Amino acid sequence: MVRFIFVSFGLLVVFLSLSGIGAGFCCPWGWSSYDEHCYQVFQQKMNWEDAEKFCIQQHKGSHLVSFHSSEEVDLVTSKTFPILKHDFVWMGLSNVWNECTREWSDGTKLDYKAWSGQSDCIVSKTTDNQWLSMDCSSKRYIVCKFQA
């Protein structure tokens, strides 16, 4: 009987791992997870170009944060406001990367928008996710994101 239970459990583990059920994903220590992506708030202030380079150095595939839903925005706001209070964070959106079309610095489509203005580099307010244009050389906080 014990052997039957052991074999049955082993088959269940193999089935679940092959089917992807319960297979989940893990973010590195200090990173938050949402919808198979990992996020981290950094308290350093940098200009947009240095911030994007910084994110790329933090983890393979990491870039400045991109938003694709209001739920994703809610998660990032819940992580940034307690740490940064009333301030701004760079988003991975600027004309530096693509003069003709708007896309995130990670190459994904700009499919969620909350514009308040337009310029070369875009920030998000930590309190209400209002998007604002800022001079790319100004120094702002950083949120990095990568797909797990």
UniProtKB/Swiss-Prot annotation:
It holds the Pfam family Lectin_C. Its main location: secreted. Tetramer of 4 heterodimers of alpha and beta subunits; disulfide-linked. GO terms for cellular component: extracellular region. Disulfide bonds join C27-C38, C55-C144, C121-C136. The keyword Cell membrane does not apply. Belongs to the snaclec family. InterPro entries: C-type_lectin-like, C-type_lectin-like/link_sf, C-type_lectin/snaclec_domain, C-type_lectin_CS, CTDL_fold. This is Snaclec jerdonuxin subunit beta. The keyword Secreted applies. It is found in: Secreted. Residues 34-145 form the C-type lectin domain. Residues 1-23 form the signal peptide. Expressed by the venom gland. It comes from the Eukaryota. SUPFAM superfamilies: C-type lectin-like. Snaclec that strongly induces platelet aggregation, in a dose-dependent manner. SMART domains: CLECT. Keywords: Disulfide bond, Hemostasis impairing toxin, Lectin, Platelet aggregation activating toxin, Secreted, Signal, Toxin. It comes from Protobothrops jerdonii (Jerdon's pitviper). GO terms for molecular function: carbohydrate binding; toxin activity.
